[in-house]
């Protein structure tokens, strides 16, 4: 059994998780990363995706995040999400609204850089939609 460490998942609305866990898989901007106890210190941005938490009791919890930052130190990990919700509580209409807004942002972009950023975000959202919502 892996050693436990402190993990917190915080959104502007509330503290979703604050407990001892064995591991956390984070959708980092540069790719998924697994955090375990005594991880090297790092701060990274997170992209829209699913955070998978393996609890110290052996259970698994999944949360959808819509961007933010992860602060990882040897003693723990704090994920500050722009928005977060348990996968089981995902609102299909809210996700559809976010996708529509991203499409509009891409269409209304003033330059190539803004368009590219909006299209990347749209791609992340549609990938997320396919990963968590049944057809």
Curated annotation (Swiss-Prot):
GO cellular component: plasma membrane; proton-transporting ATP synthase complex
Molecular function via GO: ATP binding; proton-transporting ATP synthase activity, rotational mechanism
Intracellular or extracellular location(s): Cell inner membrane
Top-rank taxon: Bacteria
Membrane topology listed for this record: Peripheral membrane protein
Pfam (any one): ATP-synt_DE_N
InterPro entries with a match to the protein in the record: ATP_synth_F1_dsu/esu, ATP_synth_F1_dsu/esu_N, ATPsynth_dsu/esu_N
Alphabetic keyword roster: ATP synthesis, Cell inner membrane, Cell membrane, CF(1), Hydrogen ion transport, Ion transport, Membrane, Transport
HAMAP family from the UniProt entry: ATP_synth_epsil_bac
PANTHER family: ATP SYNTHASE DELTA/EPSILON CHAIN (PTHR13822), ATP SYNTHASE EPSILON CHAIN, CHLOROPLASTIC (PTHR13822:SF10)
Quaternary structure, from the entry: F-type ATPases have 2 components, CF(1) - the catalytic core - and CF(0) - the membrane proton channel. CF(1) has five subunits: alpha(3), beta(3), gamma(1), delta(1), epsilon(1). CF(0) has three main subunits: a, b and c.
Family affiliation: Belongs to the ATPase epsilon chain family.
Reported function: Produces ATP from ADP in the presence of a proton gradient across the membrane.
Name of this chain's protein: ATP synthase epsilon chain
Phylogenetic lineage: Bacteria, Pseudomonadati, Pseudomonadota, Alphaproteobacteria, Hyphomicrobiales
């Amino acid at each position: 059994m892996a050693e436990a460490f402190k993990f917190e998942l915080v959104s502007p609305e509330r503290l979703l998780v604050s407990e001892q866990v064995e591991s956390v898989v984070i959708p980092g901007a540069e790719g998924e990363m697994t955090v375990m106890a005594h991880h090297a210190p790092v701060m990274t941005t997170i992209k829209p995706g699913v955070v998978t938490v393996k609890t110290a009791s052996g259970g698994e919890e999944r949360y959808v995040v819509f961007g933010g930052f992860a602060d990882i130190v040897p003693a723990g990990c704090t994920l500050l999400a722009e928005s977060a919700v348990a996968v089981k509580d995902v609102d299909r209409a809210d996700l559809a609204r976010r996708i529509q807004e991203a499409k509009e942002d891409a269409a209304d972009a003033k330059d190539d850089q803004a368009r590219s950023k909006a299209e990347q975000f749209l791609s992340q959202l549609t990938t997320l939609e396919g990963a968590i919502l049944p057809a």
